[in-house]
């Protein structure tokens, strides 16, 4: 039985900027693999029995290497788990979401991107600046 992996963008830092779909994925996940840049308050929406795995990376301080994260996502997906891969910002903007998707696709594990609000859009909006003027 194969599960499902959601590659979720948590937005630019304000927990209220995560998408409704992102929150729904967190709420139903069996496993949440989260990054350093994803606000820990988002984990409050996790089920009490959800497995929480920190996979944060900072400059020269990696809890897990990217290949280990890829393997973990594949493993949990193949175990039939619903996995929320929670990343700061958007998974496809410097989030290595493409690499994770490639590993999942090659392993035959279904996945879906859940885009996040990106900081290039959110930051000017907080300053009441138009993007297209």
What are these regions (language model features)?
Residues 1, 46-47, 73-81:
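Glycine-rich phosphate/diphosphate-binding loops that line cofactor/substrate pockets in enzymes
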Residues 1-58:
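Glycine-rich, flexible N-terminal cofactor/catalytic loop recognition
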Residues 5, 81-84:
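Loop/turn-to-beta-strand initiation segments
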Residues 23-24, 74, 102:
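Alpha-helical segments flanking ligand/cofactor-binding loops in enzyme cores
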Residues 40-41, 59-61, 118-122:
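Short gly/pro/ser/thr-enriched loop/turn and capping motifs at secondary-structure boundaries
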Residues 62-74:
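Glycine-rich, highly charged phosphate/nucleotide-binding loops
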Residues 88-133:
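Class I SAM-dependent methyltransferase SAM-binding "motif I" and its flanking Rossmann-like core
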């Amino acid at each position: 039985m194969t599960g499902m992996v959601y590659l979720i963008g948590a937005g630019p830092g304000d927990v209220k900027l995560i998408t409704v779909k992102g929150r729904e994925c967190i709420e139903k996940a069996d496993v949440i693999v989260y990054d350093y840049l994803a606000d820990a308050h988002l984990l409050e929406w996790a089920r009490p029995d959800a497995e929480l795995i920190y996979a944060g990376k900072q400059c020269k301080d990696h809890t897990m290497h990217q290949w280990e994260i890829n393997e973990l996502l594949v493993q949990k997906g193949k175990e039939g788990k619903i996995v929320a891969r929670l990343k700061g910002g958007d998974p496809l903007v410097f989030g290595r979401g493409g690499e994770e998707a490639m590993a999942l696709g090659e392993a035959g594990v279904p996945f879906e991107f859940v885009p996040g609000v990106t900081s290039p859009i959110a930051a000017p909006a907080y300053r009441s600046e138009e993007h297209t003027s």
